[in-house]
Design a protein with these regions (language model features):
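Domain-level signal for soluble alpha/beta catalytic cores
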Residues: 1-191
Length: 193
């Protein structure tokens, strides 16, 4: 009798994020990311964060899902609150009321790790840039927990004026990500146009 070889899954080289029940593929059509769970320019949302009003925050997620969002951005960063604790609460509770994939949006690496540890799926991570210290922090987390990472064309020198300067940062991002075992398909470039 001949030996049958195992069939391994084929890597289709697509950028995909997921919750525990839904997935979103990038690159085929526009992806609608709901950005109402973010305090930037939102007075009521800032108040909800300050008052620990989790039902208000969850309602923002539910409403965005009802209006067609495919991914929910989660940013709870305000200087006067404990971002780590709030990120933990919001990510945990959102997953109980919606099955949309989440975008973890924070500049705090501790809050990001807490969210990634709790997340049930493959998240969108917002964001990394070309600064060496930031790449190290974020790519270590992506390597450990998985995810697709939004990558910004900015580094220690700021945002380059030329396309060539931005391309150089993109190349540095891809090279550094590869050193951490992160595939190019798990990087989405934001050129900051």
């Amino acid at each position: 009798t001949g030996k049958i070889k195992p069939a391994y899954p084929e890597d289709k080289n697509i950028s995909i994020i997921s919750s525990c029940t839904k997935f979103v593929i990038f690159g085929q059509r526009p992806v609608l990311i709901g950005e109402r769970i973010n305090p930037t320019g939102k007075k009521k949302f800032k108040e909800a964060l300050r008052n620990n009003d989790i039902p208000y925050i969850l309602n923002e997620g539910i409403t965005q899902e009802e209006k067609g969002a495919q991914v929910l951005d989660v940013n709870v960063g305000l200087p006067e609150i404990d971002e780590v604790a709030m990120m933990e609460k919001v990510v945990k509770e959102l997953q109980s009321v919606t099955d949309l994939p989440l975008q973890i949006d924070t500049t705090d690496p501790v809050a990001m790790e807490k969210a990634l540890r709790l997340y049930k799926g493959k998240p969108l991570i917002n964001s990394v840039n070309g600064k060496q210290e930031i790449m190290k922090q974020i790519f270590l987390l992506v390597k450990k927990y998985g995810g697709v990472v939004v990558s910004l064309t900015i580094d220690e020198g700021g945002i380059p004026e030329t396309a060539e300067g931005r391309i150089a940062i993109v190349e540095k991002l891809y090279k550094t990500a590869a050193e951490y075992g992160i595939k190019a398909k798990d990087i989405i470039i934001d050129p900051l146009a």
